[in-house]
Amino acid sequence: LEPEFSVTWRLIAKTGATCRSTLEMLIDDRTKHTDTFDVVFIALGVNDAVRLRSKRTFLRRHQAVRAILRAQFSATSIVVPGVPPLGGFPALTGLMRWVLGAHAKRLDQALSSALSKETQTAYLSFDLPLTADAMAEDGYHPNAQSYVVLGERGGSGISTLVRQI
């Protein structure tokens, strides 16, 4: 994004985070910080899919996360990558791969549809290759190079939204 934009950033990440745990953390965090954000990049969904959260619950909680970011942290724009296609993860096999893959796809389609109705929100499809050479050793997480690609795509989505403001 630099040098076109002045960038300061804050990373909030937690292994196993779900929409619910993120919402709880944001509610708690808002009393501790007075930060405001022009753009927020929210990567949630994998852990909700693995826990087989219903579409309705997932969408409601994801929307609540976006709402608190806008209301309490003044987020003008929100960029959301899609729910990764768990059915392609090398670490998952057999029935687990099929069930989680189908569920993640349903959540992703519902999220894409919901976000298409919001202004100043961008959905980025998750279309990275899920080959062994693009994944970390655990076969579940992207490797460093894949995160670079995700970051570049996120930056492009942010740049597009900011230009629309």
Regions found by a protein language model. Name each.
Residues 43, 81-82:
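Alpha/beta-hydrolase-fold catalytic nucleophile elbow
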Residues 73-77:
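A short helix->loop->beta-strand "cap" motif at the edges of active sites that frequently abuts
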Residues 62-67, 108:
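Generic structural signal for well-ordered alpha-helices
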Residues 137-165:
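Histidine-centered active-site loop/cap adjacent to the catalytic His
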Residues 88-125:
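Substrate-gating cap/lid alpha-helix
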Residues 1-64:
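Conserved SGNH/GDSL esterase-like catalytic core that processes O-acyl groups on lipids
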Residues 53-61, 95-103, 138, 142-146:
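Alpha-helix N-cap and loop-to-helix initiation/capping positions
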Residues 46-47, 84-87:
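Short "lid" loop at the C-terminus of a central beta-strand within the Rossmann-like core
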